[in-house]
Amino acid sequence: MIKKMMFVMVSGLVLMFTSCGNQHKAQSLVKDFLDENLVDQDCSYERFSRLTPTAMISFGQMKAMRQNVSKLPYVKKNIDYNDAAYPDTLLYLRATYKLTNHQGEKQEVTQTFYLDKGLTRVIGFK
């Protein structure tokens, strides 16, 4: 437990010093992921939170998140998360965006996205 806490703290410091580049990369990754996996791709991004590390999400919790998300009407079914080994530490950020449906109705959505440490893939979101 102490090792995990130390790792998270050290990761936080490292991220603080490299956050600008990683923040932009994470936002781009989330945007690309949503562009590929939203049913209606008319999406405008409002804001993103800071990229933050966490070691508190187990693979079982992630599987449950994925199942819940697959029930949302604006998300495509059977998303390919390009599963590899589940990382010990994830990075997450919250994204707020607006969706516009075919009738022109807007819906604001805020979701948390979990990314791998290398910022190469979205592991899941809720």
What are these regions (language model features)?
Residues 1-20:
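Sec-dependent bacterial lipoprotein signal peptides
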